[in-house]
């Protein structure tokens, strides 16, 4: 099923038809090892924020300075999410636990990690974005659910080490893939 989804999704358009993406599929023991190591790193960051320089993504996904209307949208989304899971403003412990759910792939059995060669430019990020959307649509058409995640990007060194990804690639994002648990609020 995963191979079928990726085959269909890889038909996405790309500049000069170079289809520059790579996808690393993670399940089983590798998934567990990856989750464990990245969660440990995130807990270390919670306790020692001064170590953040050790965990930087290779490209800026979000702006350094949020502006209107994006800051309002971001806050509304955050407040809505935390409200649904009963996390009050300032409750650092509960916020940290919720944040760790990202690095547990929200309990999905499959993690997909999307990379590009570092020499490629912005156009290739647009190309891989179309491919990623195709993955999400193809998965949904086959009864699976997805959650795209940029949260993994600062931990690319850990990911690359565990998955043996070459240093000439950069992590664009991850996707949690599985069946949604409809009994959960989020």
Task: Report the location of each language-model feature.
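Acidic, surface-exposed loops and disordered segments
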Residues: 1-186
């Amino acid at each position: 099923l995963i191979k079928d989804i990726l085959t269909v999704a890889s038909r996405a358009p790309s500049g000069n038809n170079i289809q520059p993406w790579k996808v690393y599929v993670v399940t089983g023991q590798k998934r567990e090892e990856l989750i464990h190591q990245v969660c440990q790193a995130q807990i270390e960051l919670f306790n020692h924020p001064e170590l953040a320089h050790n965990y930087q993504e290779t490209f800026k996904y979000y702006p350094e300075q949020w502006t209107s209307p994006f800051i309002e949208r971001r806050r509304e989304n955050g407040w809505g999410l935390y409200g649904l899971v009963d996390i009050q403003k300032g409750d650092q412990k509960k916020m940290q636990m919720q944040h760790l759910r990202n690095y547990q792939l929200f309990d999905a059995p499959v993690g997909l990690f999307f990379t590009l060669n570092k020499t490629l430019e912005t156009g290739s990020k647009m190309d891989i974005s179309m491919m990623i959307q195709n993955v999400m649509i193809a998965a949904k058409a086959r009864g699976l659910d997805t959650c795209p995640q940029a949260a993994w990007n600062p931990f690319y060194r850990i990911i690359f080490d565990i998955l043996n990804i070459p240093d000439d690639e950069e992590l664009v994002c991850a996707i949690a893939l599985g069946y949604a648990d409809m009994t959960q609020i989020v």
